[in-house]
Each structure stands twice: as C-alpha cells, then as structure tokens.
Amino acid sequence: LMMGEIKTTKVDKENMKGEYKLKVENINFENIHSNVPTLNDISLKIKSGEILGIAGVSGNGQVELANIISGIERNYQGKVIVNGKNISNQGVRSRKNLNLSYIPENRLGVGLAPGVSIIDNSAVKDYFKSRLGPHLSSTKMLDYLNTLIKQFSIKAPDPRAEVSTLSGGNMQKLLMGRELVSNPEVIIAAQPTRGLDVSAVESLHELIINQRDNGAAIMLISEDLDELFKLSDRIIVLYEGEIVKEFDIDNANINNVGLAMAGSLE
C-alpha cells in the first residue's frame, strides 16, 4: 500500500446493523446577524455503511448543519455524538481526531487555504505527524502529493504554485483526496461533485461508495436529486431549517422529494 493510498475493505453490514456512528440530537441554531432561527430541533442518525442524503434548496440550513457537526460552528444548542461520545463542546481538531472528516462546499477558505501552495494544502500534517513523526520533509510531502495526483487524476502541473491556480474541479479532487486518505469513520460531504466533469463525478461517486462499503457513516448534502438517489440509503429534506420529510430510498419518489424541497408536499 503506497503512502496516501486509500485502502478499502468490504465490511459485513449485517454485523454492523444498528451501530450508529453519528447522532445529532435536538440541534437548534440561530443566525446572530439576522436573529432568524436557521435550524429548528434537528435530530438524525447515521449507521456504519450508510449514506444519508440531505436534500434542500440552498439557504435552508444545510451548510449550518454541516458546520455544526464538523465543529466550525460552536454557537448552537443540542448534541453531536460520534461513536457514542458527546463531542458538542469539542472543536474541529478534536473531531478530526475522532475520525470525522468534512468536505465543505466552500473549497477555498473552509476547505483549502488560499495563498498557500498546492503541496502545503495537500499535506495533512496532523495525520502524517501521528504516523511518520514530527519531522515532515519536503520529499515526503511531495511523494504524498504525487500519490494524490495519480489516484484522483488531479491536474496540478506545478505543486509549488498557489492552490488557487487549480480549477474548481481539481481543487475539489485535492480536498476530497486529502480528507479521505485517513479512511474516516464519519464523513460530512457538502456538494462534493459540484463543478466537476462527468468523468470526475463518476470517479468521486465511486470513492464515496467505497468509503461507505468500508464502514463509514456518510452525510451527503446535495441539491442534485439524481446524485442523492444514486448514492443514498435514506434522504432527509430540510426546508426553512426543519426536517420536513424523510424517505427510504427504496420507497422514494424523486418528484415527492422535489416537492418537499419546495415546501409543497403535505
């Protein structure tokens, strides 16, 4: 196994039945700038080897929910529980140490650091320090980046160029590769394939499925219903900060999900 290569191992889902990796309980959040409730009493659970799709038109609380689970947003009420541990008072780094990865919609800023080179953005320093020791050589970092470039078909002619020189699609590939390399147990992915070409979308869908088959609990936030229906086991619809409907994928109808997203489904 090469450094940085994602190892996937098929898991026996029946033996994991009922094992919830992520629980969100009674989350309430109010935007301090508008004093408008953004999330109202949100509760959900995701099992190992399960993909929960979050559907909703932009602006209905999906980003805020992802930021709360990942630890970026700390000013909320309710509980976030990973592997049975209440992590509500913990920050981003502590949550990453519990094997929770966040692939944000905002690639530059939240995901990748603007003004920083591609190679520095690619190196998950905490991850490598825990495995390779505190002294990271530029050679090790470059080897790792080359592994990501090959594995995720990233077009990065100059690894020392600023990350902003990459196309949006290649930024997303870099970000996803960096977050998935440690085989996280819980993955929060917000619009992970937006801006990618068809070939890249198929490649990243396969990666998401492999992570699910490897036992990860995955929350997939997307406005693309075709994507949600292809990948999800269940779909929850957020409308005006509330869960208005939950669908099991085997019994879901794409038109009804669309109506729920518009607030029109009784």
Region spans (language model):
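Glycine-rich phosphate-binding loops of nucleotide-dependent enzymes
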Residues: 1-266
